[in-house]
Amino acid sequence: MEPRPYHPSPEEDRASVTTTVWRPLRGQTFRDLLIADIFSDIGTFMQSVGAAWLMVSLQAGPMYVALTQTASALPFFLFALPAGALGDICDRRKLILFTEVWMAFVAVVLAALVVTGFISPWLLLALTFALSAGDAFETPTWRAVLPELVAKEDLEAASALNGIEFNLARAVGPGLAGVLIAAFGVGTTFVVNAASFIGVIFVVARWKRPHRKQTAPPEKVVGATMAALRYVRYSTGVRALIIRAGVVMFFASALLALLPTVAHNVSQSPIAFGLLLGCFGAGAVLGAFVLQSARARWSTETVASAGVAILGIATIAVSILRGLPALSVVMLVGGGAWIIFISLVSALVQKLAPDWVRARVLALFMLVFQGGMAAGSAVWGAVGQHAGVPTSLMWAGLGAIATTGLGLFWRLPDTTMDVAPWNHWRMPVIPDDVGLGLESGPVLVTVEYLVDREHASDFLKAVHRYERIRRRDGASRWGIYRDAEHPDLYLETFIVTSWAEHLRQHERFTRADHALEEKITSYTLKEPKVRHLIYVAPKS
């Protein structure tokens, strides 16, 4: 008799999910940063409520209220890419520390202006922009260090914990802000936010990040930025994630952008806005646990699409409902749907991007993500200004539901490639009299293959897949040629801008790429022969 497959009971399954979620907390640095970040994010959400309520109190219309979120999101669109390049070039700990100090300084200035009464709508938007600019420079690096703090198998759980932390702050901060605003005035929220940066600064300053040896020459900001754009262009999975996230957030942004106006129409008290935003955060905390259970049963595409569809339905419901209790329930559901989509795509980007380009890829992800939010907030705010907030929310919700159809064209991957480096290529022995420098080039690299004639067709199919890898890692041109006199000989060629860039190619090759390389060489009769040719400029 064959053994029956084991199926865990619902109680065992729930216990397994819970254990997986909390496992990353075993790492002290991750745990300390997470705890410090809770207090910092609570302060951030308290200020967000304070800023939105202050804008309403200054008699600004829905357009100005929505622009508060635009001012928070726009810096990610403008600065995320160079910030990601810095995150891959500079010491990540020092960069995080610098940005935290900058944000603390701006928060102190903003708090002083609000408390003293010298604030105006445009000044509030400008300082919100400056504060968010620090966050834009920090976030790609902050997310890039996550794989350094937890094991690879705990990365999705760590992302979920970050989501729980963030949305726990979203649940606590707004409600606390509403109480403080009602009791002591709106300036209190800005003061609390300024003080909330102290914990993170202390933990980051104490963090002893291991030094990582780099064999390839360091990149420059412009070159690193171009390398990131090239990597995303030739990485199908990463590109699909980024496109999906940007389009979804364009429509999803309407719910939070117009929530202050919805709350103000329901109740004149700031507590109502804090309650609705708190319910959204509480729902996101619950959604993080639902995500772990759902991922064990359904594909990434199914879970993500379901989350977006539910979020769209919640947005439509907010456009219809008028009672505070009903709106609170809808926001609870919407928060859970929100975190399911965000956690999934964030963890996938971190897994798909190798360490050498991770901060830059995350920066591109944040650029499109926050760009979608910034554009969406402005557009749906303008629609709300002219056609009414309910109409704006209705169309945004329908648009969010429609984005689930993108899965037909850009499907989210269920499995991730092994992007660990596979630096096994033989380094050429260069004679001293050649005078080869790091900036010498362009460099023409050729790889000669002697192919088994019976497998020539399979070889060509496999080697043409190599083009995407070569271009992704730095090649500007690529080709495969067959020798007319010796039909079994094939020559692969690609050009790299400099010798330094070719050395970086050695570090960018991954274990997943090596699997394709082994497949290609399995069709050959001997070891491929590699040559490196350096461009020789005419002498003047």
Where are the regions a protein language model picked out?
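C-terminal transmembrane bundle of multi-pass solute transporters/carriers
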Residues: 2-5, 78-82, 89, 95, ...
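Flexible cytoplasmic inter-helical loops of multi-pass small-molecule transporters
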Residues: 8-16, 154, 205-230, 415-426
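Helix-loop boundary and gating motifs at the non-cytosolic
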Residues: 15-74, 230-278
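Substrate-agnostic recognition of the 12-TM MFS/MFS-like secondary transporter fold
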Residues: 29-49, 69-87, 91-106, 123-182, ...
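Transmembrane alpha-helix termini and helix-breaking/packing motifs in multi-pass membrane transporters
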Residues: 49-59, 110-116, 172-192, 261, ...
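Helix-loop junctions on the cytosolic side of multi-pass membrane transporters
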Residues: 144, 148, 190-220, 297, ...
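An amphipathic, aromatic/His-enriched active-site/gating alpha helix that lines ligand/cofactor pockets
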Residues: 416, 468-477, 495-531
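Short amphipathic alpha-helical segments
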Residues: 454-478
